[in-house]
């Protein structure tokens, strides 16, 4: 059943992203580039590579995934917009992060420069500690943060995990030491390596590194179907909801027949 669902998921994405493009005359006539502005192994990277691999069965040209991590996704988004707007360069984006960056720092683009082709997934934020941590609840974790400066890894300053962490720290009256990684997966690797005491990362990391992690809180309005035993932050006194919508976008100046 899992394999059937995965196949259905991939085929649905393919139809959303490439259905109209395939109908366009002699398109594609060369490889399509899909820029992922995070490091290899993260949620976006894995999803992008599954989609790219599946598309090879339907397109006459491959979809090449290129990682452009760092800089809070700004370098990757910028590269996609600097490419010729002919429909051959796509960018994997995360909402709301791509929308907030132009307000947090100077960027050579705004959200209006991007045209979303399809929503791909919704990834909920989860607060993780190592499974040998002394903290078993969010309260214990925050009490610990009042007596020591806890290092917290996350994918980028200004991205949603960072904004959620700031909100949590403000509500609890504590201060975290933020350590950035190039992806959600990188944030968890930093935690497991003992470089920090906690990580705010996406839900799938619980399955990639489940044996070494303990989830303390899910930042959603209700408990996750995948982590049903983990209480929400709201249940534990902090009404913070944080999730990312991964989407594939293209330069708004791309041909209309590609965007339609």
Where are these regions (language model features)?
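Short, solvent-exposed coil/turn elements at secondary-structure transition points
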Residues: 10, 69-71, 96, 120-123, ...
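Hinge/capping helix and adjacent helix->loop/strand transition within the periplasmic-binding protein
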Residues: 55, 79-88, 102-186, 235-238, ...
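Positively charged n-region of N-terminal signal peptides that target proteins for export
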Residues: 1-4, 235
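Short secondary-structure boundary segments
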Residues: 94-95, 131, 202-204, 220, ...
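Anionic-ligand binding region
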Residues: 186-241
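N-terminal (or domain-start) structured segment
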Residues: 24-113, 149, 160-161, 170-200, ...
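Structural signature of the Rossmann-like NAD(P)-dependent dehydrogenase/reductase core
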Residues: 33, 67, 151-154, 214-219
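Bacterial N-terminal signal peptides
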Residues: 8-20
């Amino acid at each position: 059943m899992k394999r059937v669902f995965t196949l259905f998921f991939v085929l649905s994405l393919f139809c959303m992203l490439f259905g109209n493009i395939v109908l366009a005359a002699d398109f594609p006539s060369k490889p399509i580039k899909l820029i992922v502005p995070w490091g290899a192994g993260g949620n976006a990277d894995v999803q992008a590579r599954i989609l790219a691999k599946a598309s090879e069965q339907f397109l006459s040209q491959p979809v090449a995934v290129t990682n452009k991590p760092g800089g809070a996704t700004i370098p990757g988004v910028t590269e996609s917009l600097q490419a010729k707007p002919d429909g051959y360069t796509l960018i994997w984006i995360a909402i709301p992060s791509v929308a907030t960056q132009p307000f947090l720092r100077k960027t050579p683009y705004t959200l209006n420069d991007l045209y979303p082709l399809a929503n791909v997934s919704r990834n909920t934020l989860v607060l993780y500690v190592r499974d040998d941590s002394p903290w078993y609840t969010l309260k214990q974790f925050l009490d610990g943060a009042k007596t020591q400066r806890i290092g917290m890894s996350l994918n980028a300053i200004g991205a949603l995990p960072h904004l959620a962490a700031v909100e949590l720290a403000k509500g609890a009256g504590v201060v975290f030491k933020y350590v950035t990684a190039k992806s959600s997966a990188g944030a968890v690797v930093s935690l497991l390596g003992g470089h920090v005491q906690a990580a705010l990362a996406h839900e799938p990391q619980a399955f990639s590194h489940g044996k070494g992690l303990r989830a303390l809180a899910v930042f959603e309005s209700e408990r996750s179907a995948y982590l049903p035993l983990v209480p929400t932050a709201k249940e534990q006194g902090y009404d913070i909801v944080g999730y990312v919508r991964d989407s594939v976008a293209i330069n708004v100046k791309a041909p209309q027949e590609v965007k339609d």
